[in-house]
Amino acid sequence: MEKRDELYRGKAKSVFKTDDADRLILLFRNDTSAFDGKRIEQLDRKGMVNNKFNAFIMQKLEEAGVPTQFDKLLGDNECLVKKLDMIPVECVVRNYAAGSLVKRLGVEEGIKLEPSTFELFLKNDEKGDPFINESHVVAFGWGTAEQLVEMKKLSLKVNEVLSKLFDDAGLLLVDFKLEFGVFHGQIVLGDEFSPDGCRLWDKETRKKMDKDRFRQGLGDVIEAYEEVAKRLGVPL
């Protein structure tokens, strides 16, 4: 597989074309950002940890019947993925109150949500990824009603699979965001799943083991990521 021109450079990953029109290469960088890119730092080993963590999770989801864009690891910081026509919407599943939900509704952090909530946000950094609903997605042509049904179904399936996986590792899956795209007519899970895009707390101590350590200046960010990977059995 030949790596060609950079197609897109995000806050923490770069996307490259290949000699296969249906495949791309994702490069996980050490860049770490918060507050819509207003704060950016370099954290050693982060790209490697997130790349291998993502590969492990995507393979677990594939085994559970969730279609993903992941194909294979290419190295410490790179993986091969399917080229998706991305839907510009973030799907957020919450099992416990945290983050923007606490700020928006004034509820106490850590409350268990029963049932888990499902939310949609427009993927737009300039607008701060605003909270939207299903009718916005259809009315503005960001996706179809049928695609939304499938995205919600897959998001809840991901929650079912990963909540158990993390629970078995002594961790609470507090919340997470997913992005989806279309590959040859099928809705497929895209982007990545790593501690950058979810909240994970130790079951016993409620210690934060995710990107909130960076956002809140708690320190030991990569050490926490590596501890999560170790508990799950991710080979680093």
UniProtKB/Swiss-Prot annotation:
The keyword Nucleotide-binding applies. It is an enzyme of class 6 (ligase). Transmembrane segments: none annotated. Signal peptide: none annotated. It catalyses: 5-amino-1-(5-phospho-D-ribosyl)imidazole-4-carboxylate + L-aspartate + ATP = (2S)-2-[5-amino-1-(5-phospho-beta-D-ribosyl)imidazole-4-carboxamido]succinate + ADP + phosphate + 2 H(+). Its EC number is 6.3.2.6. One of its GO terms (molecular function) is ATP binding. GO terms for biological process: 'de novo' IMP biosynthetic process; cobalamin biosynthetic process. Pathway: Purine metabolism; IMP biosynthesis via de novo pathway; 5-amino-1-(5-phospho-D-ribosyl)imidazole-4-carboxamide from 5-amino-1-(5-phospho-D-ribosyl)imidazole-4-carboxylate: step 1/2. GO terms for cellular component: cytosol. Keywords: ATP-binding, Ligase, Nucleotide-binding, Purine biosynthesis. The keyword Hydrolase does not apply. PANTHER family: MULTIFUNCTIONAL PROTEIN ADE2, SI:DKEY-6E2.2. Belongs to the SAICAR synthetase family. This is Phosphoribosylaminoimidazole-succinocarboxamide synthase. The lineage of its organism: Bacteria, Pseudomonadati, Pseudomonadota, Gammaproteobacteria, Pseudomonadales.
